[in-house]
Design a protein with these regions (language model features):
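Predominantly soluble domains enriched in secretory-pathway, periplasmic, or organellar proteins
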Residues: 1-305
Length: 305
């Protein structure tokens, strides 16, 4: 059964626009959405299900990540990383990055930001580790175009999807040492998330597969076909489901790795990015709907507002 649609939250100038990776900050109850076409961050109040702010000044923003009231954005148009207070919207810092920053992660307790940069004709792809308070950086070269990244629960390692050769690259934090490459059986590693409890990574690949990997050994433990080229991928620890956004034809593929149950929920053409709001909501940013399509991620959707 498809995920239940609960409603739509309109975003100003959102119809047929271009968005990218979004993130929910539990501390403030806000969702931060990269509005790439408008060079801004859109903010949603989850409890009220309302758009509450448009934050300008994020050129070509490619993604937002959140941790305990802190937001980090990757700004492709400026080759910068922005550190933002989720409650006040105060910009705490803007840091130079490699060309075309893409995937990102933030660990507040360590004051650490991670940026995976695509590069350009003059500089190849790099992975950067940024001390947000000391304003120091470490960087390593990458073997291919980086996509999304996540960290383990202890923030001791970062996992990064590389498109070709398709792999998950693993590096120690914060110094980016002990680099390991974990090859994937499907081409075009793209979306990525992690189940900390079961120590499983979920990599959605452009060749049409969701790959499950043991996050301690790199062993591939399962592979499921998916309906198209994926983008943003989220694991919900409350439901045990993995949600893969597929922009064309416009759907979310939902897989429960432990039971094998799966479903497809039609969203809209171009809806390639989402945000998981634990425990029971999935926000699909849908240009066709002009904002956020709110879905229930629960076995009992009737109780969710």
């Amino acid at each position: 059964m498809p995920l239940k649609t609960l409603g739509v939250i309109e975003i100003p100038n959102g119809t047929d626009s271009d968005f990218d990776h979004a993130a929910f900050d539990p501390k403030t109850g806000r969702v931060f959405i990269a509005h790439t076409a408008r060079d801004c961050i859109e903010v949603i109040n989850h409890d009220a299900k309302q758009h509450i702010a448009t934050l300008p000044g994020f050129p070509g923003v490619a993604g937002a990540v959140a941790d305990e009231g802190d937001i980090l954005t990757t700004n492709r148009g400026a080759a910068t990383i922005t550190w933002l207070d989720a409650a006040t919207y105060e910009v705490k810092g803007v840091f130079p990055s490699g060309p075309l920053p893409n995937g990102a992660a933030i660990i507040k307790r360590l004051g650490l930001g991670i940026a995976a940069c695509i590069g350009d004709a003059d500089q190849g792809p790099v992975l950067q580790s940024i001390n947000l308070k000391a304003v120091t950086q470490r960087a390593i070269d990458l073997p291919g175009r980086p996509r999304w990244c996540v960290t383990d629960e202890a923030a001791e390692r970062v996992f990064l999807c590389i498109r070709e050769p398709s792999m998950v690259l693993v590096a120690r934090l914060p110094d980016l040492g002990d680099v390991v490459h974990w090859p994937l059986p499907s081409g075009g590693a793209h979306g990525l998330d992690i189940d900390h409890a079961r120590k499983r990574l979920y990599a959605a690949c452009d060749d049409g597969a969701l790959v499950e990997i043991d996050s301690t050994s790199g062993k591939v433990t399962n592979v499921w076909p998916i309906a198209g080229v994926p983008d943003v991928t989220f694991f919900n620890p409350a439901t045990g489901r993995v949600h893969v956004a597929i922009g064309e034809p416009g759907l979310v593929e939902t897989i429960h790795p432990q039971t094998g149950a799966r479903t497809r929920t039609v969203t809209g053409a171009g809806a390639h990015t989402t945000a998981i709001v634990v425990p029971d909501h999935l926000y699909v940013i849908s240009p066709r709907h002009g904002g956020v399509l709110v879905l229930a991620d629960s076995e009992d959707a009737s109780r969710i507002a």
